[in-house]
Regions:
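Short beta-strand-loop/turn "lid" adjacent to the catalytic site in phosphate-handling enzymes
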Residues: 46-103
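Generic structural signal for well-ordered alpha-helical scaffold segments
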Residues: 61-69, 139-144, 262-270
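Phosphate-binding/catalytic loop of phosphoryl-transfer enzymes
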Residues: 92, 96-99, 110-194
């Protein structure tokens, strides 16, 4: 949730080229509002939800217009804006399952004067899917091979992997667990920075085996694939509960950061 990523690409039948990409940080007011809802689980009134939906849509549109200006591209050259939105809650295992995103597509279309395609996840969930990760179909288009099996890894806030078989079966994609989200929140809490640049803080600490074991012994990691998760599950509340349950409240913050750094690759390997 650091900001809005915009990629301008040209896609032909058998090729894709990136014309340019930028990241536009969220305005502080919007980032604070998102943190309260996503990370602190604060309730929203219908009015507050609607306002935030439109405001995030405006933020997305401003980022698109800025990117077009930066790379000297007129909006009439763009076929469509694809926006998967900002996730507020992802709950594919609830009854009924759902995934809720904001960033009003109509607002994006109106302010950019470009067709906007949005709400990518709901149909997949309605048909029994997870609604996440979104990239397996794209990975299949880009990287599938008739004689090689391939795995494509994406480490963002949440890490996900796509497995492509060589027998033309459907790709398998799922979230392995936290990527950078826990480390980023811990860094923000203790250093006041959005992330641990270069991993320098984590490298100054040492892994705490007992805490790592407790983190790995979590229900999500025991679920069968395909599966998906998000920040509503892996957040500071989750981390603090693990720290308390292992009596590690007096542990140094850098050792906890080092332990979180160990968590992500271990979960990737265990899958």
């Amino acid at each position: 949730m650091d900001g809005v990523d915009v990629v301008i690409s040209e896609i032909r039948r058998l090729s894709l080229s990136v014309i340019g990409s930028i990241t536009v940080p969220y305005k502080k007011k919007l980032r604070t509002a998102l943190d309260r809802v996503v990370l602190n689980n604060e309730p929203l009134t219908i009015h507050s939800y609607a306002v935030l939906d439109v405001e995030i849509g405006k933020e997305f549109a401003e980022a698109v217009n800025y990117a077009l200006q930066e790379f000297g591209i007129k909006n009439n050259r763009i076929i469509a804006v694809g926006s998967h939105g900002q996730t507020l809650r992802h709950s594919p295992s609830s009854a009924p399952p759902y995934s809720l995103q904001i960033g009003d597509g109509a607002t994006i279309a109106a302010l950019t004067n470009i067709t906007c395609i949005s709400n990518f996840r709901s149909l997949d969930i309605a048909k029994g899917g997870q609604g996440a990760p979104l990239v397996p179909a794209f990975h299949e288009w880009c990287f599938s091979s008739e004689d090689k099996e391939r795995s494509i890894l994406n480490i963002g806030g949440i890490a996900n992997v796509t497995i492509l078989n060589s027998d033309n079966t459907h790709p398998l994609g799922f979230d392995t667990g936290p990527g950078n989200c826990l480390m980023d929140e811990w860094t923000k809490l203790h250093l006041g920075k959005p992330y641990d640049k270069g991993g320098t803080w984590a490298s100054s600490g040492k892994t705490i085996p007992l805490l790592l074991e407790s983190l790995l012994d979590y229900d999500y990691f025991k679920k069968d694939i395909p599966k998906s998760t998000g920040r509503e599950e892996f957040n500071l509340r989750f981390l603090r509960e693990k720290i308390t349950s292992t009596s590690m409240r007096s542990a140094s913050s850098e050792n906890i950061q080092a332990t979180l750094l160990e968590l992500s690759p271990i979960r990737l390997l265990l899958h």
